[in-house]
């Protein structure tokens, strides 16, 4: 909302749109003004909407993305035509691949100019078609009620995702006094699964001797976190989670084996590879989770439950397909399994032994700050309901491995697209969504610089985001792969000319300090979390540190590296000893 002593906005399309957004429950939106979207910004002056002026449109899209992830509400971003719209694209694609509900509004040249290569004209409808659930080029103000209602419904229904409304300037300026008051859209939950499919799933699970629950991001998307916890508590079935499923079970839950896949736990990967049944809940067999798909869970039948029927059998054929409401299906399973099955006791014991035997160790040799230990301590010191956002790179995997999440929405990470620069604007959006909670960003020196301009937004809004910046003066994950798989032929990964991040933060008016020694970690983290406003902790780490364990590309999860392959490779046994 902006204060003004000037005239009220006319009853035009732009004004109608701001009122419709208010009716849909939108309170905060992120954007950057420009020529073709100026009527909308004029209407904002008389609106209750809180507009956050970012410093780059990609920041707007990613902030709306983070807002939606943290709040389970629709994120809204706004940009002008041409470069403004194209700058949104990465954030929109990230939302599409991670199933994040967003409504993206772009200005467009006036309808008589469409197709004339007018100044800042861009076919954003065509440009975004592969990365949205639906898009509209609104050619008449009379279409606005239908378009807005459909946009918010489609963004939220079924498998959530982004939609885009491309709004020509003359449509924004057109008289809208005759349009009806907007009625908020309603969303029907996914249908309940067929009873026959549920019965088949129950029978398969009851017959299994070595079942594993494989939980993905669909648990949170389907509001089924508590349903999953109740089911696992009752059945005591060992459970693994994907990157975006982390937190579906608390990290300290006795039946949680942690994350599976390329950088997952040995216990999780061993359990999956040895299992005779996978109960797949809201997961999609992503390559980072499965490793070499043909050798993934080679002995297991698959029961696949998902709200998105198109995901079932897309990559791994399901023996039992259960499309529909995930929470409904889990509750049915819970009713069928009120207590653990005795014939699965040996399996539970074996998985528990793996969990204990292969628990992460934090006593790494050397003097450098050990990032896994530091992140574990950060997770312990931060409030239990803290939101931890991260960027993409080695630190992203360390966060997934060593931070403890009590709910999937406490963990904001760019899973499918792997967007460097995601973290800072996403944390910003999360802080607006959760003003009374601690929001921490863990970033790396490579990712941080990609959207560093949003420090200005955080400072201006006095958002109390806490930033832990891990600095190894390189593109760490690229360097690690060049070390392991490209014969240590290092190419274009040196960031030793990074700026002074403490001085940089202070220029923006953000409190900042640097630590270099292990003895400084406790005090540095405590001071960071105690800051009342935004703050940055610059952490120097070993430039040669790698993320372990690691499943090499195009290999089975039964093969995990614990160190440079020039030294040794350890393989996971595939069967329980008799």
Model-derived regions: residue spans:
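Glycine-rich phosphate/diphosphate-binding loops that line cofactor/substrate pockets in enzymes
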Residues: 14-26, 66-72, 96, 154-159, ...
